[in-house]
Amino acid sequence: MKSDHDIYLFREGTHAKLYNKLGCHLQSNGGANFAVWAPNAESVSVVGDWNYWSGNVDRLDLRDDGSGIWQGFVENAVRGQGYKYRIQSSHGSYGVDKADPFAFYAEPPPATASRVWSLEHDWKDDQWMSSRGPKNALDAPMSIYEIHLGSWRRQDGHFLDYRELAHSLADYVIEMGFTHVELMPVTEHPFYGSWGYQTTGYFAPTSRFGTPQDFMHFVDHLHQRGIGVLLDWVPSHFPTDEHGLGYFDGTHLFEHSDPRQGFHPEWNSSIFNYGRNEVRSFLISSGLFWLDKYHLDGLRVDGVASMLYLDYARKEDEWIPNRHGGRENLEAVDFLQTLNKAVYREYPDTLTIAEESTAWPRVSRPTDMDGLGFGMKWNMGWMHDSLAYMQQEPVHRKYHHHKLTFSLVYAFNENFVLPLSHDEVVHGKGSLLGKMPGDAWQQFANLRALFGYMWAHPGKKLLFMGGEFGQRREWTHDGELEWWVTKLEGHAGLQRYVAQLNRVYRSLPALYQLDFSPAGFEWVEADAADTSVFAFLRKPREHGAPVLIVSNMTPVPRTNYMLGVPLAGFWREVINSDASEFGGSGWGNLGGVEASPVRFHGRPHSVCLTLPPLSTLIFEHVPHA
């Protein structure tokens, strides 16, 4: 039952486990308790399959503590039945049937009722859960495979369910060497074409792919196979569907009443009122719910930029300044800080990642340093500049050289994830492979070179499904990926390259331990615009051996290319994007080169390399015995 302390935390905006108190909860001796927040309702009834959807049978009682919570026991409710709250507003004659904001399960869309359900599961991921802290740490290798469950693979045109996906996805992710998967939102959503970003069920995995227990099995199985699971989570807005959160009790309860604050013009959706404490408790509880009940390893928070700015996607007269006259959404800032503090307090071995596309400062810095408190942030600037550079014909790249070097000016201002996400392969943008210039051979070579540069660049890695084998058409949610192309040599070679790149990345601490420290990076050749060559060192902590990375972004092979290196000994070529096995031309350095005692680039030793066309090479230093 809800204690006075629960009510206090709820109204203070700091209750992090409301899902244990509100919503529908089956009782061991039969029946279920129901509770819903509707402070402006005149009456609330539970209508469902057991009472033939009559509003005259199971009426709830309003608590007398001013919380606005209606509650009651329904004797005849059993697991699996559909239900809604029939709300009669105290404002006029407005009445509506609403889905339960705290429902654990819902009917498959287009049906909109909630389902009576419970969340028991015999978890078998103890080994993962007890040891995941180092795997999710900032100094760990992190190569994330972003996936949309409805369009990764299908069976005869139909969705795979959570259990089928668990086994086939785990096999594939292990084969490809990724460390984590990031799921585009699985929170219940009425419109499949929203990809999950128009959420109505903040505590329910979508029933399109099975039950809550099926999704628990999905996470459990991936954990048992050593794969972390991250979830896209959307506290930035919600859809206006009648059964959802909007105008919940005849008033703008979850959203602002003024459309200049409460309506999102770009997404045609409602914006949460982050200044309302009960709404904050709802959202914080939703975020922690997935970490608690589903053992997820982290949240990627969608649309953070839209939350931070009151004038986001608005014309000059379409927004209301904050109390200081500024454009910053102070309530959203405070909410995000409170959310991150709650996550890291309750689940310190998980992580939060912000999708934030502006230069808002200290997104991934602790709240006690006036930061937002996220663990990491997507580096949208790196993504835009890198793709803009790679889309240039190689002959023109010398005029855009800075687009690949500029990211290192700010690379350590935040804890960055480098994303090549679903956003880059939709809405007419084409596929990653399709963005690359040249003939088919050059397109594959360009994409391999980009991936090599990306995996060596400071920051964790994220790649959307299909990019790893060079999907030809841009992504669509209405079918599966073009798996058939992996039988073609160029695509198969790219797929082998990404798998090997992941293995090399995970084996070399220099490529991940100091992702967020300037001590982990050093330019060797930053200004060779005329040759479009880039060379840099990545360094591990504790004086470990550095790794040399060299990219040649033209189709001209270069021989006897001299670069300064800090150490004598053998520099072993651990991966070459132009290797024949990956579909390349086979140029290379025959396994590596010996450093000469010739000073160059201000360093005591140097190497003379063969740089293949459109390639990235990674060299590991091997000291002499």
From Swiss-Prot:
Keyword Glycosyltransferase: yes
CDD domains with a match to the protein in the record: AmyAc_Glg_BE (cd11322), E_set_GBE_prok_N (cd02855)
GO BP terms, alphabetized: glycogen biosynthetic process
Cellular component per GO, a single term: cytosol
Keyword terms: Carbohydrate metabolism, Glycogen biosynthesis, Glycogen metabolism, Glycosyltransferase, Transferase
Pathway: Glycan biosynthesis; glycogen biosynthesis
InterPro entries in the record: A-amylase/branching_C, Branching_enzy, GlgB, GlgB_N_E_set_prok, Glyco_hydro_13_cat_dom, Glyco_hydro_13_N, Glyco_hydro_b, Glycoside_hydrolase_SF
GO molecular function, one term: cation binding
Glycosyltransferase in keyword set: yes
Reactions performed catalytically: Transfers a segment of a (1->4)-alpha-D-glucan chain to a primary hydroxy group in a similar glucan chain
Pfam family, one: CBM_48
SMART domains assigned to the protein according to its UniProt record, in alphabetical order: Aamy
EC number(s) stated in the UniProt entry for this protein: 2.4.1.18
Oligomer status and interactors: Monomer.
Function according to Swiss-Prot or TrEMBL: Catalyzes the formation of the alpha-1,6-glucosidic linkages in glycogen by scission of a 1,4-alpha-linked oligosaccharide from growing alpha-1,4-glucan chains and the subsequent attachment of the oligosaccharide to the alpha-1,6 position.
Family: Belongs to the glycosyl hydrolase 13 family. GlgB subfamily.
Protein name: 1,4-alpha-glucan branching enzyme GlgB
Organism listed in the record: Albidiferax ferrireducens (strain ATCC BAA-621 / DSM 15236 / T118)
Gene: glgB
